[in-house]
């Protein structure tokens, strides 16, 4: 009979990856990042544990969406007060806080529980090509989110 192996949290190897979001499709990029944060790309994946890696996303202001989503996609937030609903389009939010667009997309693809909140802290999003995590010696990860007609 096979035995179920649970990875030891102390011995897990958590790597750091850098992903360039320039000219990448938002949803496809977010789904790839969510899988890495969750650890689904590793043989040690366990649904109830944090087995994923850290992800740094640079050039968040250059992420793109297809179709008319740049003018029609809405981001909503509420202050909690009566009449406190704020609505912003993709274009306006990208001009104001481009990191929040990528964070919002990835957060929606993580579990909606305490594990998901813990995994979300392992995502670092920056505008521009630089980041302050050189000490962690992150690996560059190439993500191709532009679909081609080849199957």
Curated annotation (Swiss-Prot):
- Transmembrane stretches, by residue range? none
* Pfam families, sorted: Ribosomal_L13
According to UniProt, the name of this protein is: Large ribosomal subunit protein uL13
| An example Gene Ontology CC term for this record | cytosolic large ribosomal subunit
Annotated PROSITE patterns: RIBOSOMAL_L13 (PS00783)
Q: Which domain of life is it from?
A: Bacteria
Q: Give GO MF terms, alphabetically.
A: mRNA binding; structural constituent of ribosome
The record's keywords, sorted A to Z, are: Ribonucleoprotein, Ribosomal protein
**Gene source species:** Rippkaea orientalis (strain PCC 8801 / RF-1)
